[in-house]
C-alpha cells in the first residue's frame, strides 16, 4: 500500500512534505498510505514508518489514495515525476476551502542535474503551474486540493533556473502533466 523510493546517493530536497519537509538532504522519499479518516499524529506516524521500514533521512508524504492503483510516473529528459492523485477535496487558491476530505495530490520530482536552491524553488513554481493547468484542462474547477504535497530532489549544482522559458522547466511541465493526467485517470477508474 506504500511506495518507497531510495536514492543511490543523497540528494538536496525542497518540499512541503509532512516528514522532513523544507530544505533537506534526503536519502529518498516515500508515499505513506493512511486511512481516509486519518487524524493521527503525523510526525510520530511518519517517524514510525521510517523506523519500521529501515529508512533514515527520507522525505515523507501521506495520502489516503490507494497508492498501487493511482501511482503514475513520467520521465522527460532529466526529470522524473512520481504522482499520486485523488481529488475529493478540490480547492481554488483564494476561496474558502471545502470540508476537508483525505484525498490529495502528491508530486515528487527527481531531477538528474545539479540545481541551486533557487532553481529548486523555481521547479516547485513550474510544477505547480503544470498541476493547475492539468486540472483545469481536465475539467476540474480547482487549482489543487487542500492538502497537496510537492517535493523536488536534485543534486546541488550550478543550474539557476527551472522556469517555463528553460528546457528544464519545459521538461518539468511535461513530466508533471503526463504523470498527473495518468494518475487522475487511474483514480477516476477506481471510484
Give residue spans per PLM region.
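Alpha/propeptide regions of enzymes that mature by internal proteolysis
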Residues: 1-191
